[in-house]
Regions:
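Secretory targeting and sorting signals
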Residues: 1-27
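Hydrophobic core segments of beta-strands in well-ordered, beta-rich domains
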Residues: 211, 217-231, 289-315, 353-371, ...
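Blade-edge beta-strand/turn elements of extracellular beta-propeller
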Residues: 174-197, 266-279, 329-347, 389-412, ...
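Blade-level signature of beta-propeller repeat domains, shared across WD40, Kelch, NHL, RCC1
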Residues: 472-505
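Beta-propeller blade signature
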Residues: 233-257, 316-332, 377-384, 444-450, ...
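N-terminal regions that are enriched for targeting/export leaders
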Residues: 27-291, 295-296, 305
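Conserved blade-ending motifs and adjacent loop-strand segments that build the rim/top face
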Residues: 27, 199-200, 451-478
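Repeated scaffold domains used in trafficking and secretory/extracellular systems
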Residues: 206-208, 286-291, 344-355, 416-420, ...
Length: 505
């Protein structure tokens, strides 16, 4: 979650882990930060000892922060404005990876401009006398006012009444053994091989959700994204070229050395476009965050959540609804479906953060409530009816039941956060990865059927080793033995590729 700050910010990027590094966690030995092929310094998300050659950080006087709530009336023109679908085709990247494609937009920083993450503190001498800071904390109070015409209404799908079908548990399977897990490389941001800051004005972003858009090509969608003005320490300010989401493409099949991003959806040269617009108004709609993607034929789909506001309680947020959007031009422009929405009545909606997976005749929807203290529910719908909410069947006590989204039986014991689910055709097993905030681990479960029986968890990444890591989004070209997935790290606010070597059983 975004931490409270003393100025108006985007409050972007959902997913900061609930747990900080435990006091007993031993740091790894210091190592110099990674450097890409252009000599640009990147980020190391691993918990390490400080640089022994660095001078000790100055000690700052303690501060007592006293926020004073100040209501702020915010008029919100309604209905929502139509999306800006301005798009610019991606030009081929330069053959020299260190040459920027748009030096007029942003050129490479000189050596003096290079920045490396470091501890920050006061430059004055230490003092035992605390500094008292009283500051206004503006709390938006949005109210609707008449606006423009907005989007034309969409025809509602014809309501259907699917039957109650049996959905017995599958056979129990053994969890895979874990041979190793390693950090492959930094995918986004300054110092990455993809140089997304120079090529697409993506300095800070998170998530990195994958799906295969067509044979041989994957899409990679990111959450709240920031450009010029972003600084190390979490998500950026609302003035730092904030976009609620962005989309990249890759055909790179050799993942053991990283993933190459070849193009992004652009609204101007070298500038990644926002796909799903948001009002960017706290307590109305702060942002729209993709939660999964999939393709049915030539149509691309995104599940997403409309975030009302981030809570001051770590790991909590309130959504307006979870919804579906689709694209018929390969992901360049998107339409939010006005009817395929799961409203968050009284904050107890079960399918606010959804991971959707086509398999056979159905699309399966794994869902959790807003925040990260909820349980996992499951639904399915025939692929032809994916935009018809009345056609969904929810898994309840061993049956597929229509109109039962609030009654869905939990798939596993315990809480989960931001799911990623994949069916591995070679092994015939389902793979599910998510952050378990109760133990501070990104974990893997497997099953023979989407409704389970799901195995016990296999720990993949610990937040003791990768402080405030979150995510765990599976690359679709993973296998039963080689699981590639992305994680995000809050402080460096960028995406990293991980590789787990598994021993299927």
């Amino acid at each position: 979650m975004r931490r409270p700050v003393p100025h108006a910010t985007a409050l972007g990027a959902v997913f900061v882990v609930l747990l900080t590094v435990p006091a007993q966690a031993a740091p790894f030995p210091w190592a110099p930060p990674p450097v890409n092929m252009c000599g640009e310094t990147g980020f190391d998300p691993l918990y390490r000892e400080p640089d022994p050659a660095a001078p000790p950080a100055p000690v700052a006087a303690p501060t007592i922060d006293i926020p004073i709530p100040v209501p702020q009336l915010i008029p919100v023109p309604m209905p929502d404005p139509p999306p800006d679908n301005t798009r610019v085709a991606q030009a081929p990247l330069p053959s020299d990876p260190c040459r920027n494609p748009c030096p007029d937009v942003r050129d490479s920083p000189g050596p003096a401009a290079e920045t490396v993450a470091s501890a920050q503190g006061s430059t004055g001498s230490a003092s035992a006398v605390p500094r008292i800071q009283i500051r206004p904390e503006y709390e938006p109070m949005p109210f609707p006012v008449p606006g423009g015409e907005g989007e034309p209404p969409q025809a509602a799908p014809v309501p259907v009444k699917p039957p109650v079908d049996p959905g017995p548990l599958g056979a129990a399977v053994a969890p895979p053994g874990l041979e190793s897990v390693r950090l492959v490389e930094q995918v986004t941001g300054h110092g990455s091989r993809n140089r997304t800051d120079m090529r697409w004005q993506v300095d800070g972003t998170d998530l990195g959700l994958f799906w295969e858009t067509e044979p041989g090509r994957v899409a990679m969608v990111f959450g709240d994204t920031f450009g010029a003005g972003w600084v190390y320490g979490g998500a950026g300010a609302d003035t730092a070229d904030w976009r609620s989401n962005t989309l990249a493409y890759s055909t790179d099949r050799v993942l053991d050395d990283g993933i190459d991003i070849e193009a992004m959806v652009q609204d101007s040269p070298c500038h990644a476009a926002e796909l799903l617009g948001s009002r960017k108004i706290k307590n109305w709609e702060t942002t729209t965050i993709p939660t999964s993607g999939f393709a049915l034929g030539d149509r691309q789909f995104l599940s997403y959540m409309s975030v009302n506001h981030w809570s001051k309680v770590p790991g909590m947020w309130l959504t307006n609804y979870g919804g579906l959007a689709y694209s018929d031009d390969g992901g360049q422009t998107w339409t939010k479906d006005q009817h395929a929405r799961w409203e968050n009545l009284f904050g107890v909606g079960r399918f606010q953060v959804a991971a959707m997976v086509p398999h056979g005749e159905y699309v399966y929807m794994f869902g959790t409530p807003n925040g990260r203290i909820g349980v996992i529910g499951l639904a399915r719908v025939r692929a032809d009816d994916v935009l018809n909410k009345t056609a969904y069947q929810y898994w309840v006590d061993g049956n597929w039941v229509p109109a039962a989204e609030y009654s869905a039986t939990p798939l596993v014991h315990g809480i989960a956060s931001e799911l990623s689910v994949r069916f591995d055709a070679e092994s015939g097993r389902w793979q599910m990865v998510y952050l378990d905030p109760a133990v501070g681990q990104i974990v893997l479960r497997t099953a023979a059927e989407p409704q389970g029986r799901w195995t016990e968890t296999v720990p993949l990444v610990s937040t003791q080793d990768y402080p405030r890591a979150y995510g765990g989004f599976i690359h679709p070209w993973s296998t039963a033995r080689d699981l590639y997935f992305t994680v995000s790290a809050w402080d460096s606010y960028n995406v990293y590729l991980m590789h787990a070597r598994l021993d299927p059983r």
